[in-house]
Amino acid sequence: MELLVSWYQSIKLSWQKLTKIIQPLVFAAIVGFACNWLGVPVGWLLGPLLVGIVYACLQEKREPLPSSFIKVSKAIIGLYSASRFSPDTLILATTYAIPVILCILVTGALSIFNGYLLWKWAGVNRLTSFLGSIPGSAATLAMMSEEFGAEPITVTVLQYIRMVIVVITIPTTVTILFPNEALETIMTVQPAVNDSIVSIFFNLPVLAGCCILGIILGDLLKLPTTGFLGAFLLGLLLFWSFPGLFFVPHWLWVIALILVGLSIGWRFNFQAVRKLWKPILLEIILVILLMLSCFVIGYEFHLITQIDLVTAILGFTPGGIEAMIATANQLGGDTGMVLAIQITRQMLILLSLYLLQLTQNISKKKAEI
C-alpha cells in the first residue's frame, strides 16, 4: 500500500512539473501563431519570447525550462541551417574571406569600445564590461566570465539585454526596410509539397539521430551554442552526401523557434535588471548605436561584394544568430552566408578568449615561480 502511495505521489509531482512546462508552451504557440498571422517579423520567435518574459515577471520562483528543450531546439535550427548551406555558399564565403574578416574586426572593435564606455561611465568592472559587450555565444561568455575574474551575473544581464534588443528590433527593422522581399518569400518558405523522395517516416528518425549525435558531439567538443554547431556539422555531412533526399519539415522549424523564443524570455530576471539599471540604460543606448554601425558596415560590405543587402546586414548583426537565420529565411536572404559570417565571428571571439585565458594562466604560473 505504501508503495502505491509513493508511486501516486511521484506521478502527481511529475504531472505538476509537466503542466507547469506545458502551459507556457501552449501559450507560446498560440501567441506565436497570432504574431505570424498578423505578419509580425519572425512571429514564431518573437511571440514566444514575449510570453517567456511575461511568465518570468509573474512567477518569481519559476521552474527552469529543461535544458534538453533548448538543446534540441538549437539542434533543429542547426540542421535547418545545414540544409540551406550549400557548397556554393562555402565557396562564396571563402572568396570574400578578407572583407568578411575586416568587417568582423571593425564590429568587434566597436563592441570593445562599448565595453570601455560601460567601464568608464557606468562604473562596471573592466573585464565584466568587455565580456558583457562582446557579441557572440552569450551562454559561453557568461560561463567563462568567472574564470576571468569578472562578475557572472552582470555579464549575463548585459548579454541578455543585448540579445533581446537585437532579436526584437533587427527583424522588424529589416522587414520594414525590405517589405517587398518579405511578401514574396513568405509564400515560398512554407512549401506544400517537398521535393524529397524519402518518406517522412524515414526522414524524421534520421533527423532525430543527427540532433542527438549533434548534441553529444557539441558537449564532447565543448562547442559554443550547445547542440547547434554539432547538429550543423552532422547536417552538412548528411545533406551534402545525399543531396535532395532529406529535408527539415517546416513545422519542425516552427517548433524550434517557439522553444528558442520561450527560453530566451524565460531567463529574464527582473530583480537583476532593477539592480543594474544604470549600466543597462547605457547598454541599451550603446547597443542601438552598435546596430546602426553594423547596418552601415553591412551596406559597405554589400557595395564591395555585391552580396544582397539583406544577407549583408543580417550577417554583421551583433548576435541573435537563430533570429537572424529565421529573418534571412523569411526575407529570402542567403541563410548559409549569414550563418557563415556569424559563425566566423563567434569562432574568432572564442579563439581570442581562449588565448587570453591561456596568457592569464601562464602569467599566474610565472608569478607563483
Language model segments and positions:
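Small-residue-rich segments of transmembrane alpha-helices in multi-pass membrane proteins
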Residues: V72-F85, V106-T107, F130-M143, R162-T169, ...
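Transmembrane alpha-helix boundary signature
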Residues: K61-E63, S83-Y96, I112-N125, Y299-I304
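Alpha-helical membrane segments and immediately flanking helix-loop junctions
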Residues: L118-I161, L309-Q342
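Membrane-interfacial helix-loop connectors
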Residues: T94, F268, I280-L281, V287-T344
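Cytoplasmic-side transmembrane-helix entry/capping segments in multi-pass membrane proteins
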Residues: P66-I77, A97-L102, G123-I134, T156-I161, ...
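Structural signature of multi-pass alpha-helical membrane transport proteins
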Residues: E2-S68, I76-T89, L110, N194-A272, ...
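Membrane-embedded alpha-helical segments of transport systems
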Residues: G136-L141, T156-F178, S293, I321-E322, ...
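Membrane-interface helix termini and inter-helical loops of multi-pass transporters
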Residues: P87-T95, L177-V198, F242-V248, R274, ...
